[in-house]
Amino acid sequence: MATRSLIAIGSNIGNRVGNILKALSELSHVPGVTRITSTGFLYESPPMYVEDQPVFLNTCCEIETSLSPRNLMIALQNIEVSMGRERTFKNGPRIIDLDILFHGPHVVNDPDLIVPHPCISEREFVLAPLADICPSFVHPVLKKTIEDIRKSLNAYSTCHRVFPACGDRSLFRWGSRTFIMGILNVTPDSFSDGGLYNESVDAAVCHAIDLVAAGADIVDVGGESTRPKAEIVDELEEQRRVIDVIREIRLKFPNLPISVDTYRASTARLAIEAGASIVNDVSGGLLDPDMISTVSSLGVPYICMHAGRVGSHPPLMYGDQSGLLEDQSFSRNLKSSLDTVRDQLAGRVDACIASGVARWNIVIDPGFGFGKSADVNFALVRHLEDAISGVIKPYPVMVGVSRKRFVRDLVAGKEWCGSNEHAMLGTVAVAMAIQDRADIHRVHDVAQLKYALCVSDRVYRRHV
């Protein structure tokens, strides 16, 4: 009979993100481990006991296993050895550290093995990812839930949730500030910038350089327009447009987070191999059944968006329910619309977790535009917190309102509205969304947004 076991994972030497991913892969292939059912978010923290060493990355995972606690300990130690861990002194630096925290309800008190782990209650870097997975799990000895134990840890937090935007080379600390994704469309038919950067790789790379200089933290490369009624491009043409551009940007910027804007698993894989570090999927995995499993196998971040419609594709279906929120019934019942976005997006996140996508690699996007009426879009701006409540509340959020039609149409025909006002208004809408917890903003006009964020972050980000 399988037992639910919780494992702590840490690294502070070498490629820490890569080490943790490799350890998870090795663990999934251990005989007697049925599957890895969940992971926590990723946390960075200073060393706790021996301070003269590099900072740690930590997380936890939950597995189903038929192994006894002792045999599981032996398997974990074998993984550590195979990955090159050298035991020097207690609490010293290590390429990988794997510890059994809980093994179901079992209690073990042997000289070389104690389960539950005796130091759980004093380690925030263990309690934080544990609470991500199982906050209501009751410690079999302390008789308290994980969440209650964490709350009783009356210490100043030095444990920060982070996002491997470009592996270990570029870690975003969530909550420290708002991050900017600059848009690079290498398409002939995108609404506002189609045809500007698709004529040559050099033109696209030059624009990427401009985006970074203006303050972009991520450059998002897309090869197919997703505007309403846009022509569907075949995958070979999409790949022809984006792969060489991504490869050249990576040569220019070794540590820059680069995302590929695609709903195709084959394009995502080739883009990651060319140097992209994030997959940005406007369909949340609904337009290609292989997308989520591909992202899981690649071990890269995945931006999972809610959409009712993408380009000229038929409306997206979430089970037996459409994602379209365009007709007047939704405009009359905005709460129902927000609930629909929340529930359907939660279902896609569940699909990611079930397919083995690490929790720390998931970013959610409510999908401004994309089959939503203007009323629904403005409700999302105003009540973003409601649309990302419940089980998806802990996840970081990306929003994209830049040059969207619902903003543009608001001022269409106004005599004071010149050629650039729609961009300015989009920036204002983005800044408004920040207070309801947007972590990344996807925009065309990076410089304008950068200025707005200087003010907004000062108001809404308590760490700034």
Residue spans of the language-model regions?
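Hydrophobic/aromatic residues located in beta-strands of well-ordered beta-sheets
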Residues: 5, 36, 180, 258, ...
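N-terminal beta1-alpha1 ligand-phosphate binding loop
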Residues: 2-46, 50
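Short, charge-patterned binding micro-sites
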Residues: 38-65, 223-233, 313
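N-terminal amphipathic alpha-helix/helix-capping segment at the start of soluble metabolic enzymes
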Residues: 158-191, 357, 413, 460-464
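Flexible, gly/pro- and Lys/Arg-enriched active-site loops
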Residues: 48-56, 70-73, 77-169
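Active-site-adjacent loop and "lid" segments of alpha/beta metabolic enzymes
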Residues: 149, 190-206, 226-251, 256-257, ...
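Short, conserved charged micro-motifs
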Residues: 16-18, 67-73
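Catalytic domains of carbohydrate-active enzymes, especially glycoside hydrolases
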Residues: 206-222, 433
